[in-house]
Design a protein with these regions (language model features):
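C-terminal accessory/binding modules appended to enzymatic or scaffolding proteins
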Residues: 1-15
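Long, contiguous, secondary-structure-rich segments that constitute the structural scaffold
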Residues: 11, 15-144
Length: 144
């Protein structure tokens, strides 16, 4: 499940401090029920891999009984930052679009479907890649 964030408008404002509330090592949080976390050997603050057949992303785990068992939640809006990792090319910042279903509701309506899908969440055991998406680009002087 991927709801909209109350701290940003889609991906706008992802680089402001309020959008980083609840983040873990500057990664978008994935919310999980305590029972599901326990079964997987996960704890609050872990960096986890969220994956499905469409893609994968790294998130910071937030454990909460406000999430129904069997469900995880990643809010929309984290900026996309793909990196080559031991698990393949994945988003390291927690962009929910990497795992969301990308189909239209019908040929007539062309609306979006609910941002849901089947994912698996596991502990990230490799070195945690740095989040660089907020860094300023390297300055390049114009050629005269």
């Amino acid at each position: 499940m991927s709801p909209k964030s109350r701290y940003r408008m889609h991906s706008q404002l992802d680089n402001v401090n309020t959008a980083r509330r609840g983040s873990v090592e500057e990664r978008e949080p994935v919310w999980m029920n305590p029972a599901d976390a326990q079964v997987r050997g996960l704890k609050n603050g872990d960096v986890v891999l969220v994956k499905c057949r469409r893609g994968a992303c790294l998130c910071g785990l937030q454990v909460s009984d406000r999430i129904k068992p069997g469900v995880v939640s990643i809010q929309h809006g984290a900026w996309f930052e793909p990196e080559n990792t031991p698990a393949g090319r994945i988003d390291v910042h927690g962009n929910a679009n990497t795992i969301a279903i990308d189909v239209i509701t019908s040929k007539i309506a062309r609306g979006n479907v609910s941002s849901t899908g089947n994912v698996e969440v596991s502990l990230w055991k490799d070195e945690v890649p740095p989040v660089r998406i907020f860094n300023q680009p390297r300055r390049v002087n114009a050629v005269k």
